[in-house]
Amino acid sequence: MSARIADIAHFDGFWTTRPAESRPGQRYWYIGKIDGVINYVRRMSEWTVTAALFEFGPDNEPKPIIGIVHAPALGLTYLAARGAGAVRIHKTAVGEKRDKVVPSMTSSLDGSVLSYGMSFLPGESQRALDVASSLAGRPADIKRVGPVSLDLCKVADGTYDAYFEPMLHVWDIAGIAAGTVVVWEAQGTLSRWDGERIHWRHDNDVVPSNGLIIRELQHYLQQYPWLDSINQR
């Protein structure tokens, strides 16, 4: 993927080899490895390959502006670009089907369908499980499939109404960024659990949503703040 993308004009390099200091307007591709390695190894269909293009803004902070999430085993590809919307391409037996990506209109946690992510680190996983337990009786269902890039896209296309993950690390950036652009361009919302913006050069907790249930959900998320997770690691 990197070799093919290298032929594209108007970008300044790759995220992992970018200089220590970047200038406003510079753009770098981040090519992800397999997102959902455990699913892949266990021959589940829910795994992806991802790519995201970052642009440094006037404040010298990076922001993803193009996102690609490809799930080969599912025959699904999500594409999104800043200001151009998001599209889902579904390969079927009779050809490709292209749909505009739009989130759900669910306006309450009651009867909603949520998804969440977990970590291989016990303290981080416990934080997610605590939130899921506290939500019992509100959503119609809470799913756990992964990976994060696909879960973000499923929030964007209305499969889920929201998703929460307690800790995403720097090695997750490609998948998070690609899925984030899909969410943004579908007019969904995405932030940290405390409502602050994502920091693209640091670890994050994340909560994308359809934008209609985020305040209700954050009431539960904020009962389990970031420092609790860090202290348990």
Please provide the spans of the model-predicted regions.
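N-terminal subdomain of lithium-sensitive/metallo-dependent phosphomonoesterases centered on the IMPase/IPPase/PAP
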Residues: 1-35, 219-222, 226-233
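Helix C-cap/helix->beta junction micro-motif
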Residues: 8-9, 60, 186
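Acidic active-site catalytic centers that drive phospho-/nucleotidyl reactions
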Residues: 17, 32-35, 39, 151, ...
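Solvent-exposed alpha-helices and their adjacent loops that cap or buttress functional pockets
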Residues: 20-23, 42, 59-61, 79, ...
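DPxDG-like acidic metal-binding loop motif
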Residues: 25-91
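Short amphipathic beta-strand/extended segments with alternating polar/hydrophobic composition
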Residues: 61, 80-81, 94-107, 218
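An extended, acidic
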Residues: 101-233
